[in-house]
Amino acid sequence: MLLFLEMEPEYVKQAFRDLFNEEKSVDGRMDRFVFYCDELLRMYRERHPHSIENNHYHGNDYDMISLYLTFRYPADYAPYSLERLISLLRKLGVGNLPQANDPVRYFKVMRTLFKLMQKEDGIQARHQERLTGSSYYQGESLLLAHDFACFITDDRYAERGLCRPYPGK
């Protein structure tokens, strides 16, 4: 993305402005962002045909796009993974599993989990315990629901550092 920003700063800014426009549907914004990135990669390849960076972009990677949304709107979005969504829905006993990427459904599930978790007194306090110091975002964030989803779906997420363990664990 930094190479794209260096190459076409206004185009990249427009891509992010569109992605962060909450007046439009999130699935449409994410799909348009994929289109913007495809175009940027096409331009980059034309200008730098022998660059190793030509193979770095991973197509319609909603995972990375969701991370941009999470950083911009932490109370509304969480890092997306189709694998995590399917595993989470299985663990929750949901029968209608997605057959393809469905970040909109994932965000809805995260918001629902977060609301349920907020009703449990000890969970929020325990979460705040691990966010010591000024380097951690202190506002409302779906990352609590994301951590829960990681915890109940796959221990590999914690091992790779994508889910931060609670103190004393």
Say what each PLM segment does:
Residues 65-69:
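Cytochrome P450 catalytic-core helices
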Residues 1-58, 74-169:
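An N-terminal alpha-helical hairpin/helix-loop-helix interaction module that forms a charged
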